[in-house]
Amino acid sequence: LGKNAAWSEQLQLGMNTWRRNLDRSLSPDFLGYHGVAIADVDGDDLEDVYLCQPGGLPNLLLKQQADGTWGDISKKARVDWLDNTTAALLVDLDNDGDKDLALATRTAFLISENNGKGRFSLRERLSNLGSGYSPTAADYDLDGDLDLLILRYASDNNKTGDFPTPHPF
């Protein structure tokens, strides 16, 4: 990553740099580390890396090149979200053979569909879930398709003792 601008201009600088330099209105959250997801996003049989970032810094999609170097394709792939992102999943949510992107942010859960060539389109923005952490995917109900489980920490209930219920999408 040494010759990659994402490394030298963002990752190498560390959290203290961003804590001092990001506008407070972005509410950068530096509690713990942010997530990472690894999968082949463009069908070249090389694993790529998605790095979640605190608010105000673009999330990064780093594409592995055949020569072992890495290129930042975040903007081209349309996944350079500036939202405070806590976790990511790269998993085939629509059963078309490629890896889609699911992101837990402090304000919403985002699901972006992959076109098979590493370009993503936002398909769902679930704002009513609040801030999510640690999403996982499995066929929980055994119906043949993947389901998402999104965990939340210290979230409010609806004041009647009920907690969030499933949200189909």
Question: Where are the model-predicted features located?
Answer:
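Short, solvent-exposed loop/turn segments at conserved positions within beta-propeller repeat blades
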Residues: P54-L57, T107, P168-F169
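Beta-propeller blade termini
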Residues: Y33-G43, K63, N84-N95, E113, ...
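Short, conserved, GDST-rich strand-edge loop motifs in beta-rich repeat architectures
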Residues: R152-F169
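A short loop-to-beta-strand structural motif that recurs across blades of beta-propeller domains
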Residues: L60-L62, A108-L110
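Beta-propeller fold detector
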Residues: L1-G2, G71-K76, S121-R125
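Hydrophobic beta-strand segments that make up the repeating blades of beta-propeller
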Residues: D48-Q53, K99-T105, L148-R152
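Repeat-based blade/solenoid architectures
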Residues: A5-G35, A77-L89, R125-T136
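Short loop/turn segments that connect beta-strands within beta-propeller blades
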Residues: Q65-G68, N114-G118
